[in-house]
Amino acid sequence: MLSIKDLHVSVEDKAILRGLSLDVHPGEVHAIMGPNGSGKSTLSATLAGREDYEVTGGTVEFKGKDLLALSPEDRAGEGIFMAFQYPVEIPGVSNQFFLQTALNAVRSYRGQETLDRFDFQDLMEEKIALLKMPEDLLTRSVNVGFSGGEKKRNDILQMAVLEPELCILDESDSGLDIDALKVVADGVNSLRDGKRSFIIVTHYQRILDYIKPDYVHVLYQGRIVKSGDFTLVKQLEEQGYGWLTEQQ
């Protein structure tokens, strides 16, 4: 599904990613961990298509297509979803209008018929019930006045509606209390269907107690220096990153 080979990325002429390689197959959950400044969020931003991140080497393919040649909008159309650490607030735009516009843009890109407001309302009722979310979430402005937990619920709702093939969560657990953390975990777990893949970028181990990843990767100085299964999370929890960084 996603194949990253020897990726090099710079920001303001400073090299951040220095030869990162990663393969993600359908249905897999990959956790990306590492100390501050290791390049975790740079990887997320690059996959999402942020313009201020300059790819200076390597390749990224998604479903056989050159991802780096696609605009952020086309990446969304191809099935990539990005949940940012700090979701954007959009005053005056209701969640329902935002989601219908986003979904119909994706459907148009794929050559599918767009949904009118009645069909979309039926879809929203189904997703709201599935995720056990409050219905008033739809009438409120996008993320305006939302608590941390409500913003994360909104991310999960967007994922459920857009049905992406690859979901990237960029430090979505940062600053959350345990209840909000469980909202994120429950939402992700409810969307795991054996086909949809996830990349969970996190500085902490605690969210991975609720979302058990198939693979765990440690990023350090712009490269993946260690990969393993969930036991690597426990090892990092007990020993920190020092034992890995000292080997580099």
From Swiss-Prot:
PROSITE patterns reported in the protein's UniProt record: ABC_TRANSPORTER_1, ABC_TRANSPORTER_2
Cellular compartment(s): Cytoplasm
GO molecular function terms listed in the Swiss-Prot or TrEMBL record: ATP binding; ATP hydrolysis activity
Name of the protein this chain belongs to: Probable ATP-dependent transporter SufC
Subunit structure: Part of the SufBCD complex that contains SufB, SufC and SufD. Interacts directly with SufB and SufD. Interacts with SufA.
Main subcellular location of this protein, as a coarse class: cytoplasm
Keywords associated with the record: ATP-binding, Cytoplasm, Nucleotide-binding, Transport
General function of this protein: Has low ATPase activity. The SufBCD complex acts synergistically with SufE to stimulate the cysteine desulfurase activity of SufS. The SufBCD complex contributes to the assembly or repair of oxygen-labile iron-sulfur clusters under oxidative stress. May facilitate iron uptake from extracellular iron chelators under iron limitation.
Segments forming domain ABC transporter: 2-246
Biological process per Gene Ontology, one example term: iron-sulfur cluster assembly
GO cellular component, one term: cytosol
Native species: Escherichia coli (strain K12)
Binding site for ATP: G34, P35, N36, G37, S38, G39, K40, S41
Stored Pfam families: ABC_tran
SMART domains: AAA
Family affiliation: Belongs to the ABC transporter superfamily. Ycf16 family.
SUPFAM superfamilies associated with the record: P-loop containing nucleoside triphosphate hydrolases
InterPro entries cross-referenced by the UniProt entry: AAA+_ATPase (IPR003593), ABC_transporter-like_ATP-bd (IPR003439), ABC_transporter-like_CS (IPR017871), FeS-cluster_ATPase_SufC (IPR010230), P-loop_NTPase (IPR027417)
